[in-house]
Amino acid sequence: MNIHKITRYLLMLCAFTFLTLTAKGQDGEPLRLAVAGVSHGHLWEVISRLDRGDFKIVGVAEKDDYLREHNGLRDKLDPNLFYADLGEMLDKTHPEAVIVYEPIYDHLRVVEACAPRGIHVMVEKPLAVNNEHATRMASLAREKNILLLTNYETTWYNTNHEAFRLIDSGAIGKIDRINVYDGHQGPFEINCGKEFTDWLTDPVRNGGGAVIDFGCYGANLATRLMKDEKPLSVYAVLRQNKPNLYPKVDDDATIIVEYPSATVQIMGSWCWPMGRKDMHIYGDKGYIYQDTPKEMRIYTNGKERQEIAPSLNAPYNDSFYFLKAAVRKEIDVPPTDLSSLENNLMVVRILDAAIQSAKSKAVIQLF
């Protein structure tokens, strides 16, 4: 056998081994997954993946009698998997991880139940309603050595990760400004379910309005982009443009976060004429416009070009693949990760400061 045949054989063997290991990581034994709460509008993310095979729902806990009987999972799972009490469900079904579709205020309650049992948790964004809750959740997670992850839609955008890569390579130079835009026409306007809006528009159960619902995206991305820099201060304006629809909470938020080397402006709104989740990043050598999950514009060397961002590889392209891989210790979750506890503690700190700033009409110093 000549050297070329040997080389070709070794390359084929390496490729086969890689594909086999990748398939094993994604397939393997399904993750034993439980669901806490069914009132969140993002419950469809579970429903749409039920038949995929990477996880198995072993239990659903919902304290509201009506919602426990009337939800999108009810006709797809064995009725015996539904429980009124979270603790009972955890003790009888022994999940590896719990995904949370409760009001944000109840994230703490779920972690208080899961952490002592050694069960990992993934919540929908943001991590918590305030610093007090977030600190307690983090303490429990660290003490009991569980993963406490936060899921954002934008974490799985190809364009965001391509932006990170370009910035890390120095393509646009030193970042000096980031503008983040997240929002839509409003929860009522886009016909969110009543079970969702009942708490989404409640200042206690959700922690706020648009500032929490959409301000968290920008805080999450900015924390990742600014890496080791800590925010110096936060100034925010929270408005009620539609008090007849949202009398208890803000429906439009502008948050200015000052870093030692950059200014970040986070705009979250329930008042825009369309839905959007995009970001403009400016450096001293160029800019990146993250326009959609797949499309972006990049300005370097005096020219703008449009690009389709490369697709993300599993498990980094899907929240459930990611959760399974993290729980099974197939991947690490570094502090810089968008889903990490460290990142999301900072997110809550920024949002908490934004609410304080709007109330006091003053700049809130952080570090």
List where the protein language model places each region.
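C-terminal helix-rich "cap/oligomerization" subdomain common to oxidoreductases
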Residues: 97-99, 325-367
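Predominantly a Rossmann-like dinucleotide-binding segment in NAD(P)-dependent oxidoreductases
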Residues: 29, 155-237, 241-245, 361
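Bacterial N-terminal signal peptides
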Residues: 9-20
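N-terminal Rossmann-like dinucleotide-binding module
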Residues: 21-76
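Bacterial N-terminal signal peptides that target proteins for export
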Residues: 1-11
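Contiguous beta-strand/loop segments that form the cofactor/metal-binding neighborhood of enzyme cores
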Residues: 220-295, 321-330, 353
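Rossmann-fold dehydrogenase core element
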Residues: 136-154, 174-176
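Beta-loop-alpha module in the N-terminal Rossmann-like domain of NAD(P)-dependent dehydrogenases
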Residues: 67, 77-140
